[in-house]
Amino acid sequence: MPTPVSECLYCQRNETLSKLMVRICDLEVSQLFLFKEQSYHGRCNVVYNDHTVEFHELSDDQRNAFMRDVARVGRAIAKVFSPEKINYGAYADKISHLHMHLVPKYKDGPGFGGVFEMNPQKTFLSDEEYAGMVEKIKAAL
């Protein structure tokens, strides 16, 4: 059953969201967040502005605009962090609000050659480190 708007962490901008992510900026039709758990250095989420669950619910123009946002963030991550590969994931099994995980992968890093862990709970940074990453990503957009 889809998450109702009243319980959606992306729509409500609740405490759970602030524990998981740092807001970076608004994009064309979405918002960009830095995932606080940084086992995959540079991991971000691109979150569609409206409470939509599935890609097929978007019009062609909406879908294309969302994917432009995703591609823009992918280019910024590539520029700032130089990963070997970026994995893209749109699951929304538990949080039914359209969003895309952008997960940089590094040859000698965790999960290279496989699927990334959703939240390994291993690598957290200081507020200053998050702020520095946010500024670098913003500058690369």
Language-model segments: which ranges?
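HIT superfamily nucleotide-processing domains
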Residues: 1-141
